[in-house]
Amino acid sequence: LTKIKYSVKATPIKGRLKEASIVPYHNVFGLILVLDDGKAMPEKKDISRICAIDMGINNFAAITNNIGVPSLLFKGGIIKSINQYCNKRMRKIRSVQTAGTTNKFKMTDKAHKVCLKRNNQIADFMSKIANKIVNWCVQNNIDTIVIGKNTGWKTETNLGKVNNQN
């Protein structure tokens, strides 16, 4: 194993370290630190200002509320586009590797890079949307966010005539 040193003094960490874990992610490793800042959790107040989030495919999230503020709608086309482009590139890599042979496809460095890029783009999109939702809730003093249970989600989705892209 390689010895890696990380200077915690250089980072603005405030609080007591409770847990540290290393998580593999594609060809890299992530360091997750859990800190205790010593602050008590805020007490629950009267729940009166509620927003509801409806997750979807064409519309990634539709957000409404009970206080009369205009609703939010986040389109999901960007995620569909990212997935479509990733599937196209993976299909090409798979085709080149398995052309003229009976060997099964094995993940290569190039395939890992394509998947990593896709996952990073999706994570970036999700992070930005979550940040916008939280900021909107704070701005409008929303105290409760409700996200429905999505049992059987996407079962009635029309994925098209040909669906052979994993």
PLM segments and residue spans:
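Positively charged, helix-rich recognition surfaces that bind polyanionic ligands
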Residues: 25-166
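Acidic carboxylate diad motif detector
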Residues: 1-23
